[in-house]
């Protein structure tokens, strides 16, 4: 949507050398998104997410990812010049479940923050991807000091001490929008 509105957009993530990875890469490029990690990996498949939407509006998620290409993103894949030229960097916890992708994302967010760029983060806790909630919370806790915009669901509010704690949490970490 950002690229369709004429803004410069990039995607820094690993894709597998498979039908889905090639499709995603081609689609992103067709839509005007610069693919910052253009080499497809043969080491893992492109991670797939399947969403089930129930009649009551609730959702459940199933992932094909053992391992997924997104988990193979490394610090070396992060182009420092692209981060320095960006106006904003967005990341989410989904591909921060394991190293080396966790470290690569932390590095990109810190680099963006240190260079005065806006940083957006989606807690996006998915129980099937993490050992437990505490593991996700521990990783998210490492991110907050770099974040300007925090996306968090009602179910994830305990990560920040509950809804009543949001103003204090924002002040403590310098977050502008939750």
Regions found by a protein language model. Give the residues of each.
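Beta-barrel outer-membrane channel/assembly domains of diderm bacteria
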Residues: 1-5
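Conserved N-terminal subdomain of the carbohydrate kinase-like
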Residues: 8-93
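Active-site beta-loop-alpha junctions enriched in small/polar residues
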Residues: 66, 94, 124-128, 155
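Short glycine-rich, flexible loops that bind phosphorylated cofactors or substrates
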Residues: 71, 97-98, 128, 159
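Glycosyltransferases and closely related glycan-assembly transferases
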Residues: 99-116
């Amino acid at each position: 949507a950002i690229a369709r509105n004429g803004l410069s957009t990039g995607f820094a993530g690993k894709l597998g050398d498979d039908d889905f990875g090639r499709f995603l890469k081609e689609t992103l490029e067709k839509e005007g998104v610069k693919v910052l990690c253009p080499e497809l990996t043969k080491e893992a498949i492109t991670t797939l997410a399947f969403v089930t939407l129930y009649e009551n509006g609730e959702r459940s998620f199933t992932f094909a990812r053992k391992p997924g290409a997104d988990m193979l993103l490394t610090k070396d894949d992060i182009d420092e010049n692209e981060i320095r030229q960006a106006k904003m960097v967005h990341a989410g916890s989904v591909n921060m479940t394991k190293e080396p992708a966790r470290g690569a994302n932390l590095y990109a967010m810190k680099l963006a923050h240190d260079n005065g760029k806006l940083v957006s983060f989606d807690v996006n806790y998915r129980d099937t991807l993490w050992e437990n909630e505490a593991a996700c919370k521990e990783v998210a806790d490492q991110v907050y000091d770099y974040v300007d915009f925090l996306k968090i669901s009602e179910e994830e509010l305990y990560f920040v001490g509950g809804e009543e704690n949001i103003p204090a949490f924002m002040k403590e970490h310098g977050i502008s929008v939750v």
